[in-house]
């Protein structure tokens, strides 16, 4: 069995300060994932950025509430994001597949087993799964706190030996890093 790694990339890593997708950074990420695959790793990418990409794509004609914004911008942005990933990975002849999931898919049962089987079939056939929460239909109270949580669940589900979180946060903290009493945890085992 190949070594398995989950890479999570956050919106702040994927976007420039003006809110547009950072194609240069995404290209560098794709280069590194292609290298990992050449070293006999199975890679699963958990990618944020759909809402940001959608927000950049469309200015709405009326004020939207937070749920409407998330639904509209994620629907638009997911297509844009996957299109860019498709173009970048195609340069390495790497096929990608989209996996949109919800928190309920991680409860024991058929949905959990089906989701795991889907990603195993993709990996067995050389397809790189790109995972994100299905923000267009997820219910606010039942959503992941963020894709850090989602990537941890994916890593556990897929029995990954490594989880890499690419973020603009300086590490793992005891509390929200914006809290002045939060302390950096120097090592997680």
Question: How does the language model describe each region?
Answer:
Residues 1-189:
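Nucleotide/pyrophosphate-binding catalytic subdomain
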């Amino acid at each position: 069995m190949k070594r398995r790694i989950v890479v999570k990339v956050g919106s702040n890593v994927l976007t420039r300060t003006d809110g547009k997708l950072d194609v240069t950074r995404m290209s560098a990420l794709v280069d590194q994932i292609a290298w990992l695959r050449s070293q006999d790793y199975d890679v699963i990418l958990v990618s944020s950025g759909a809402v940001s990409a959608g927000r950049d794509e469309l200015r709405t004609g009326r004020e939207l509430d937070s749920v409407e914004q998330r639904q509209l911008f994620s629907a638009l942005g997911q297509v844009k994001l996957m299109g860019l990933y498709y173009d970048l990975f195609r340069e390495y002849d790497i096929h990608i597949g989209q996996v949109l999931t919800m928190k309920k898919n991680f409860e024991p049962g058929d949905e959990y087993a089906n989701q795991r089987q889907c990603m195993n079939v993709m990996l067995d056939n050389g397809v790189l799964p790109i995972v994100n929460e299905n923000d267009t239909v997820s219910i606010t109270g039942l959503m992941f706190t963020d894709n850090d949580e989602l990537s941890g669940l994916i890593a556990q589900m897929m029995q990954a030996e490594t989880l890499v979180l690419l973020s603009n946060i300086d590490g793992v903290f005891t509390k929200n890093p914006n809290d002045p009493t939060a302390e950096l945890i120097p090592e997680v085992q």
